[in-house]
Amino acid sequence: MPRPFFLFAPGAGAPSTHPWMQKWKGYLESIGEVALFDYDYMREGGKRPDPPPQLVAAHRSALAEIRKKSSGPIFLIGKSMGGRIGCHVALQEEVAGLICLGYPLCGGGDRTKLRDKVLRELQTPILFIQGTRDPLCPPDLLEEVRSQMKAPNSLHPVEDGDHSLRLTKRGLQAAGETQDDVDQRILAAINEFVGLTAFL
């Protein structure tokens, strides 16, 4: 049985070489093959993200390269913006599933600027990994959107987690845990999601 393949997209502010991305690449390699890529503006040294159609085109181009290499199920996983753009790609491309590491539901943290239209249009199974302290995705708003989605969707909440799924030192001490413990539970949730959806 072919191993799953993760196409791992970065967030707006940190390219694929960022330590956070590299850490999660290493974790994901325990489940399947992993390919990282960068959007055009990152490769060109820019700070401001490209217009959404250009981001989607770059993401689809990276996916096309993966299809040449993999016969297994392909999952689009992304940090923040990378997860959101992956959702747009899934409206145009067939993939096994979507995994969003900190979905940026509220544009700029503004509860009135919801990026929920694409979520409501999705048919592809999706897993949200979400910190409960993330100002870009308040838990109550995400639950409201999830309840109205057509796509099979699930949530792994990271209690006390921020937009990068990191806990405060106080939170870790109170729970008697390390960040690695938290990360391993996230990885287990991803592994379970992949197992349930890879060959649907």
Model-derived segments and spans:
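Serine-hydrolase catalytic machinery in alpha/beta-hydrolase-like enzymes
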Residues: 2-74, 85, 165-175
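The conserved beta1-alpha1 loop
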Residues: 7-11, 102, 130
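Conserved alpha/beta-hydrolase "acid-adjacent" motif
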Residues: 17, 135-141
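Short beta-strand immediately N-terminal to the catalytic nucleophile in serine-hydrolase-like folds
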Residues: 73-78, 101
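Gly/Ala-rich beta-loop-alpha elbow adjacent to hydrolase catalytic centers
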Residues: 78-82, 86
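A conserved short beta-strand
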Residues: 94-109
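Short beta-strand/loop motif that positions the catalytic acidic residue
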Residues: 121-123, 128-130, 134
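C-terminal catalytic histidine-bearing segment of alpha/beta-hydrolase fold enzymes
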Residues: 153-200
